[in-house]
């Protein structure tokens, strides 16, 4: 019984420990506890060990002793400390928690803290065992309660238990400020001056705040108590949430923010001052200056940039023809030669220009958008260039002014108008980067290849690239006898009638031969193809075994297929008296009489031929692999029957050139390089030929294989019968001869490059460098007389107008001065006689010798602009002068005085005209180096860009095997598209057929005849009174 009790106590202890160990929640305390632990430790222990040793005694052994050490384990008990969790005093463990403990149980309540009960309603006393009616308490409930505000009195002591929100002995007081609830124990959490209700704790917020805890400001637009009032502020002004006073945003003022800042001020409180020029106001919020029309900038200091106008320069001028517009209102200010609201109307007619519209434009108007009404310069249509707009854009350029670079690849041309790529034959795609798909070729890859036997088609020309062992136009003919490989270019090395494989040249030996090249006979005892068969001859009775068919050569008096018998033919047996029944020259076994079949036969009586595919002795040899013939062979000899048009041991070769048909016994009759079909004899004509014998040239306007394609040449030009290439006149190019040479190129198919030595030349599409209009001479450096007179007349007319205006102004000033002078004389009552003196300059300035001079202001109007390859821009021949030359006479050495006048030309004007070059006749710059727009030309003389200009060699030799194919590499010679493109055929035909400008003999001396001319006449000269020329 005692052990059971001990076990139960131990279990209770364990459970209690487990319960304490799992305690959780409040009212748990920690304490230190001592406990014992048994530990095992080691110890070194000494001991004596007895032994024996030799000694002089009997028996001769003596004892010996020595001390040794050993390790032993021992156990001891030690005390340790540990921290344990346990319920604090007054609490006991229950269901894993520490709960209060009342020693006297609460009868009508519950224990809420150590030794304290919380009684149910209507009960009281330490143990909640007293119950009195409401309003009474004490022993026998004889005493009346005096609690206020719905408070409950304790039935035992009469103490008042106050309702929520009240306090005091009798619960007569509300909770002090900042507290609320039962026993006023809860603390208010209202913020920003808010007060809470003493019962519920609800916050009553101060003005300007809201929210359960008064922690939020009034929302925008609200203010006051409970944020119930609306703000009166305008323009996004904010009101003060407590008082409702408006706080204005920058740029606004007034009680309700209704007014902008006064002019000249801006920003928060309108305290910032504007700093704008031109009297411009500033923005009332940002202070940004609001510039008047025509001005811009942070402070309206800058005028509008070119081609802009209006407020903030936000409007774009829409004036045409480089006209400027008024910066304030956008009114167009037209350049000379233009009129209209937008300066879009020419003063002159479309083909006229000049001050009086008396000059005719030299532009090709079909390809010209504009002939400038003042200068006569041609503004070319998109895709056209040159001074007269007669040339399409040069290679690889397109678009307005030919400024854009084409992105076409692989020799393609591009449309000079929109840059669309016109692919060369064999290419496709937007930029011609994609090769034709297999099986297609030609322009736009529109043609289908007709190559056979695995041949590939060259995408540009459609030429068939034959695989090894094949040839002919369509790769439909095997290699001829004794040739093999790619293009049948290799020679076979097979001997002794061996067959040569046309693909790889391997040898197939005839029966009786072996070796890689069939150079060795079969060894003795072997025969047949590859010497694979063993001779069956009785070597005792035979002389030899034929290496070809295995036939035995018997000794004398011996016979039979294998030389096996000495009986006469047709008999067998011991006495050779039995008749042999074997057929087809077969023999009998001399003993048994069984048939020994001859080559090519089988069966009991040798009556059956070898099965298909076999032949020879005992039908053991297989027929050779036949390339172009019947699958079977002769059952006796193994010979094969080739298909029509083939020969060779294995029918591997077609008929030799010029032969066709069965056994290649028929003769071909094809002409002009036509190839004869080795099977049918039908002629396959080269491109450009037709007819059954290829003896007829393609009809007019047709070309190509079978004459199936039509020529597309313009102007009735002839096309080549082989490839359709048009034979163009000089100055034209393109597959249709419809493209004039681009700027800078000339001659046959535009193959020559212009390298004109000066700006007075122009590149003629047919003849190369020729003089520009208005120039003549070997070096094109002499003005034609009519051109010089016209230029001088116009310049003289301009000078006359200018001098007239100067004289009129001078005359008006003199009249005004005389009027003032005499007015003063009269007012002073004085009389004076005026003396006017005219002086004569007896020492006119020294003038350097000079033959003549040109004023080039208008001298370049009729010129064609040209981009030179390797030359500097030639300057005008106007020598810089400070005074006007009046040299005259036969040698231009005489000088004449012109009254008392000494006229000095404006130096800037002279320099301006002196430095004018052909790119801009009136450009002025202080530095002559800067004046040469084309001074740095990278391409030296003779340079040609291989990526742009490939020269086509029309005399390119043809190959022996493909004489009808020529690869076209020139970018200009690609087959043209039918797409719409700029056409200048009509005008350029006229242009190229025009005679070249006449060449006048070079004048030795040309001078103005100034002998009887004074300055007035020179200054006011008209076209009718032009100075004469002296020769």
Swiss-Prot record:
Glycans are attached at residues 73, 140, 183, 312, 329, 358, 418, 504, 540, 584-585, 630, 695, 795. This is Protein draper. It is found in: Cell membrane; Cell projection, Axon; Cytoplasm; Postsynaptic cell membrane. It is a single-pass type I membrane protein. Residues 940-954 have a biased composition (Basic and acidic residues). The gene is drpr. Residues 1009-1031 have a biased composition (Polar residues). Residues 99-129, 137-172, 180-215, 223-258, 266-301, 309-344, 398-433, 484-519, 572-607, 660-695 form the EGF-like domain. Phosphorylated on tyrosine residues. Phosphorylation is induced by binding to prtp. It is also induced by binding to the membrane phospholipid phosphatidylserine. Phosphorylation may be mediated directly or indirectly by Src42a and is required for interaction with shark. Residues 1-16 form the signal peptide. Pfam families: EGF_laminin (PF00053). Induction: By axon injury which results in up-regulation on severed axons with levels reaching a peak between 12 and 24 hours after injury (at protein level). By ecdysone. By detection of apoptotic cells. One of its GO terms (molecular function) is phosphatidylserine binding. Keywords: Cell membrane, Cell projection, Cytoplasm, Cytoplasmic vesicle, Disulfide bond, EGF-like domain, Glycoprotein, Membrane, Phagocytosis, Postsynaptic cell membrane, Receptor, Repeat, Signal, Synapse, Transmembrane, Transmembrane helix. Receptor which is involved in the phagocytosis of a variety of cells including apoptotic cells, severed and pruned axons, degenerating dendrites, salivary gland cells, germline cells and bacteria. Binds to the ligand prtp which relocates from the endoplasmic reticulum to the cell surface during apoptosis. Ligand-binding may promote tyrosine phosphorylation mediated by Src42a, interaction with shark and subsequent activation of phagocytosis. Also binds to the membrane phospholipid phosphatidylserine which is exposed on the surface of apoptotic cells.
């Amino acid at each position: 019984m005692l052990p059971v009790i001990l076990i139960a106590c131990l279990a209770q202890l364990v459970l209690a420990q487990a319960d304490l160990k799992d305690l959780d929640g409040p009212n748990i305390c920690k304490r230190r506890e001592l406990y014992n632990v048994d530990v095992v430790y080691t110890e070194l222990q000494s001991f004596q060990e007895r032994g024996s040793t030799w000694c002089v005694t009997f028996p001769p052994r003596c004892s010996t002793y020595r001390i040794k050490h050993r390790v032993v384990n021992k156990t001891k008990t030690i005390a340790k400390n540990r921290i344990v969790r346990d319920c604090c005093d007054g609490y006991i463990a229950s269901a894993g928690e520490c709960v209060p403990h009342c020693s006297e149980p609460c009868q009508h309540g519950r224990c809420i803290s150590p030794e304290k009960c919380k009684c149910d309603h209507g009960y009281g006393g330490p143990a909640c065992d007293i119950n009195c009616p409401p309003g009474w308490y004490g022993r026998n409930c004889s005493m009346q309660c005096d609690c206020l505000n719905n408070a409950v009195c304790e039935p035992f002591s009469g103490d008042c238990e106050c309702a929520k929100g009240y306090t005091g002995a009798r619960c007569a007081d509300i909770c002090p400020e900042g507290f609320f609830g039962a026993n006023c124990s809860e603390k208010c959490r209202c913020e920003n001056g808010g007060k809470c209700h003493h019962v519920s704790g609800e916050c009553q917020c101060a003005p300007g705040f809201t929210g359960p805890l008064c922690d939020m400001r009034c929302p925008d637009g609200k203010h006051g108590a409970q944020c119930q009032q609306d703000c009166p502020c305008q323009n996004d002004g904010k009101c003060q949430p407590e008082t409702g006073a408006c706080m204005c945003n920058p740029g606004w003022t007034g009680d309700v923010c209704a007014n902008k800042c006064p002019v000249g001020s801006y920003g928060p409180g309108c305290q910032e001052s504007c700093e704008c020029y031109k009297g411009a106001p500033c923005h009332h919020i940002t202070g940004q200056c609001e510039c008047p029309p025509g001005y811009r900038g942070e402070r309206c200091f800058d005028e509008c940039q070119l081609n802009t106008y209006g407020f903030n320069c936000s409007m774009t001028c829409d004036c045409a023809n480089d006209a400027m517009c008024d910066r304030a209102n956008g009114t167009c200010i037209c350049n000379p030669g233009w009129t209209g609201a937008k300066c879009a109307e020419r003063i002159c007619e479309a083909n006229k220009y000049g001050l009086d519209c008396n000059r005719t434009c030299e532009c090709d108007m079909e390809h010209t958008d504009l002939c400038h009404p003042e200068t006569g310069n041609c503004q070319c249509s998109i895709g056209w260039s040159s001074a007269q707009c007669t040339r399409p854009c040069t290679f690889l350029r397109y678009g307005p002014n030919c400024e854009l670079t084409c992105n076409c690849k692989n020799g393609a041309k591009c449309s000079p108008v929109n840059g669309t790529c016109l692919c060369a034959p064999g290419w496709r795609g937007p930029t011609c980067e994609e090769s034709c798909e297999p099986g297609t070729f030609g322009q736009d890859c529109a043609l289908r290849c007709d190559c056979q036997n695995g041949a590939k088609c060259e995408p540009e020309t459609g030429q068939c690239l034959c695989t090894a062992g094949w040839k002919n136009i369509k790769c439909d003919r095997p290699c001829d006898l004794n040739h093999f490989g790619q293009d049948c270019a290799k020679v076979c090395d097979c001997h002794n009638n061996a067959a040569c494989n046309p693909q790889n040249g391997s040898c197939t030996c005839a029966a009786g031969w072996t070796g890689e090249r069939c150079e060795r006979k079969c060894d003795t005892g072997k025969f047949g193809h590859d010497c694979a068969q063993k001779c069956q001859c009785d070597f005792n009775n035979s002389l030899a075994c034929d290496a070809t068919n295995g036939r035995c050569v018997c000794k004398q008096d011996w016979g039979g297929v294998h030389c096996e018998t000495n009986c006469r033919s047709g008999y067998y047996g011991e006495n050779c008296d039995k008749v042999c029944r074997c057929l087809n020259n077969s023999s009998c076994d001399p003993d048994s009489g069984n048939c020994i079949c001859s080559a090519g036969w089988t069966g009991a009586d040798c009556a059956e031929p070898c099965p298909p595919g076999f032949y020879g002795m005992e039908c053991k040899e297989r027929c050779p692999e036949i390339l172009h013939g019947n699958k079977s062979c002769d059952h006796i000899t193994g010979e094969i029957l080739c298909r029509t048009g083939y020969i060779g041991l294995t029918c591997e070769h077609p008929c030799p050139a010029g032969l066709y048909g069965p056994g290649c016994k028929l003769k071909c009759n094809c002409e002009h390089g036509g190839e004869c079909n080795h099977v049918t004899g039908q002629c396959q004509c080269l491109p450009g030929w037709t007819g059954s014998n290829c003896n007829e040239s393609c009809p007019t306007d047709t070309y190509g294989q079978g004459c199936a394609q039509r020529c597309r040449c313009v102007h009735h030009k002839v096309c080549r019968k082989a490839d359709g290439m048009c034979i163009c006149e000089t100055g034209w190019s393109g597959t249709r001869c419809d493209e004039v040479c681009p700027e800078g190129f000339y001659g046959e198919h535009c193959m020559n490059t212009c390298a004109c030595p000066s700006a007075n030349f122009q590149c003629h599409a047919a003849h190369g460098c020729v003089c520009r209009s208005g120039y003549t001479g070997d070096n094109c450096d002499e003005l034609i007389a009519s051109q010089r007179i016209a230029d001088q007349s116009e310049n003289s007319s301009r000078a006359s107008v200018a001098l007239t205006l100067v004289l009129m102004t001078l005359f008006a000033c003199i009249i005004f001065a005389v009027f003032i002078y005499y007015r003063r004389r009269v007012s002073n009552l004085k009389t004076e006689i005026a003396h006017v003196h005219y002086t004569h300059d007896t020492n006119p300035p020294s003038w350097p010798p000079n033959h003549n001079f040109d004023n080039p202001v208008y001298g370049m109007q009729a010129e064609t602009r040209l981009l030179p390859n390797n030359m500097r821009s030639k300057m005008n021949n106007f020598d810089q002068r400070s005074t006007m030359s009046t040299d005259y006479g036969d040698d231009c050495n005489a000088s004449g005085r012109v009254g008392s006048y000494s006229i000095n030309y404006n130096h800037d004007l002279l320099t301006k005209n002196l430095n004018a070059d052909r790119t801009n006749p009136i450009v002025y710059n202080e530095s002559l180096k800067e004046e040469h727009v084309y001074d740095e030309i990278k391409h030296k003389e003779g340079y040609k860009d291989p990526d742009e200009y490939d020269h086509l060699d029309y005399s390119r030799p043809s190959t022996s095997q493909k004489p009808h194919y020529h690869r076209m590499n020139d970018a200009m010679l690609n087959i043209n598209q039918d797409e719409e493109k700029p056409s200048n055929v009509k005008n350029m035909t006229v242009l190229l057929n025009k005679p070249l400008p006449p060449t006048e003999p070079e004048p030795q001396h040309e001078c103005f005849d100034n002998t009887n001319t004074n300055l007035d006449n020179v200054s006011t000269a008209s076209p009718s009174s032009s100075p004469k020329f002296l020769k």
